Regions:
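An extended, acidic, His-containing surface patch that forms the Zn2+-binding/catalytic region
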Residues: 1-99
């Protein structure tokens, strides 16, 4: 698969950042993660960036033996997803203009 990158100044990325900050009660940091999914193709087809709400930590060993996830972080991720709907609705005009 090709690399996929979402610009941090895109309105959808800013909305995700605000949603995560609201759920976790503090500012969040951007990270880059590797993967082998179809994200680049999906972003190209939709003509929009993809935004992931990551709620795992390195010690969770995702897709490795003894994989785990902290329930408290998983629930905060669900809370962030709920905030994200409001944030995206608030910037709907900006999202349309960014396409």
């Amino acid at each position: 698969t090709r690399p996929c990158f979402s610009p941090v100044d895109h309105p959808a990325v800013a909305a995700a950042r605000r949603a995560m900050s609201a759920a976790f009660g503090q500012d969040v940091l951007f990270t880059r993660e590797g993967g082998s999914g179809p994200e680049a193709d999906l972003a190209a087809i939709l003509g929009a960036p993809l935004v992931f709400l990551g709620v795992t930590v390195d010690s969770d060993r995702i897709h490795a033996p003894n994989e785990r996830v902290e329930m408290a972080l998983l629930l905060k991720g669900a809370e962030a997803a709920a905030y994200l709907w409001d944030e995206l609705a608030a910037v709907a005009d900006d999202l349309a203009a960014a396409r």
